[in-house]
Each structure stands twice: as structure tokens, then as C-alpha cells.
Amino acid sequence: AEPDDAIQKALSGFIARAGHHEISALARVALAEILRQKNPAEARAVALEAVERHPQSVGAKQCHNLVAQIEAKELAVATERTWAKPWPALHVTYRNIDRFHLRLVKADWEERLLEGKPYGYGIDQKDRERILSHPSIQEGTVVLPPTDDYRSAVKEVPVESVFGTETIDPGAYWVVCSHRGDFRERDNVVSATLVWVSRISAVNTTDYQSHISQHTGYVVDLESGKPIQGAEVTAWRRDQKSLPRKMVKQETTETNQDGQYTLKADSGQETVFVVSSALDGQIHHVLTEPERLWHRENV
């Protein structure tokens, strides 16, 4: 932006004239903050000079913090919620690391539901400790192109290049990622993503404008694309009376010949559905995203 260019020019001129004085360290903080978005490496160099020239100054301490932020390690991994053939990819956003490590860990989805956690996000410290205490089913390491410019980079990593997909049984798993091989949390970035290895896809078709309070959807075999008849669909609803508010297992139905299911809806109550079916001799499960349907009175 032009205002930033003018400020940058003014700050650079001030630093050139007053570089010997510790007040220039404050100018370097301001200049580094402007440069940070466009050129993190240059911003780091500007801030480091303040630290070296005037280490005891207020500006140098602020520059030290800025350098630490620019040098901070970043790792975020996103992937499809359901894994099936063709296997998806891991979408990796990273900075200041040259590799990361993965573990595939069995997830107790029913335990999470009973604790009132029907989703894979919102991992707290207790969850993280529990996940890291479980043995891994498989492990892998991904080498990344370096980010010498201190910018975030994105890389797509095929799941099949990391894990032996042919030996992964259907079920729920945590994909645990760490830039440290020992997965310890000190000086580390550890994340966990819940995935379902399953051929089942549950498609929500609930009409939220309808006056009929019911949840509807279809269950499809991802491999063949055909509807699954006889799949078991169980509703779990949020218990408003318990603290913390747990999910409670309630009624079950089966899909018809078109793969369709219908279950009653309790107005305003958060509901998820566990869908199960035997396919080629193996039981497959999948958990839907939470739904909430409000009853509409006839007008």
C-alpha cells in the first residue's frame, strides 16, 4: 500500500540518521512490522540488527519477540473426513520445518459421544494426552521443501504415500501430526484430526423449512455409488439435563431399498447419526455432522 511505502521510506531514513542511538530500535520494530507481510526474511534481518546494536533497549526486546514470531514453527494438516478408495490427500500448511511425522491411532468414537463430543475438532489437553497415550497403528514421515523465506507453504501429500492403506481396517482414527519424531509437546506443534475409514457416505436431505419434524437422508456405498439397503442408522441426541451435556444413544432405524432413512426430530436438540453396514464381510461405520432442526408451526 502507498501509505506503507511512505512510512517505510521515512523509517528507513530515520534509522540511517539515528542508527547509533537506541531510539532507532523502536523505528526498526515499526519497519519490521511493515515488512513482515511482504518479506518476512527482510523483516527478520531488520529486527535482528536492533537486537545486536542495542540489546538492552525496549525496541530490541520488541524486535526479539518479532523475530521469535517470524521463526516460529507452523504445522496444520487438513484432510477429507471420510477415507475410502480413491484415497484422499493430506493438505499440509507449514513454516520453518523441513519434515513432519504422523501416527494413525484408533479413535474411540463412542467414548467421545458419551462425553458430549460429537466432532473431531475442539481437542482439549485431556483429549490430546489420551490420544498420545494410545499405540499407533501405523507411522510415517513426510519430508517437506524448506521455507527459507519464513513464509507459510502448502503441500499436498497423498495418504497412500504415507500409510499402507490396504491394511487399514474400517473404523475411526486419529491422524496425529508432529514436527518432532517423539511427539512430545515441548517446543512442538501436535495436532490430531479425526477421520473415518469407511465406504459409507450419509447424505443429509432434511428439509429445514418443512412443518414435519423429521430427519431424512440417504446412505450410499462410496465404492459402487449405489444405495445401501438395511444400513443401521442410530440417533444420538444432546442430553440437556446432564452437565457436561453428553450425547445419549436413542432410536435406531434401517434404510429402505433406496438407501433412505427417516427419524423423528426433537425441536432444537442437537443430533448426530451413527450409520453402520456390513460390506463385503466388514462392518463399516460413519458419523454424520451434527444437525439441529427447529419445529415450525403451521401458519
Annotated model-derived regions:
Residues 1-299:
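N-terminal, cleavable Sec-dependent signal peptides of secreted/periplasmic/extracellular proteins
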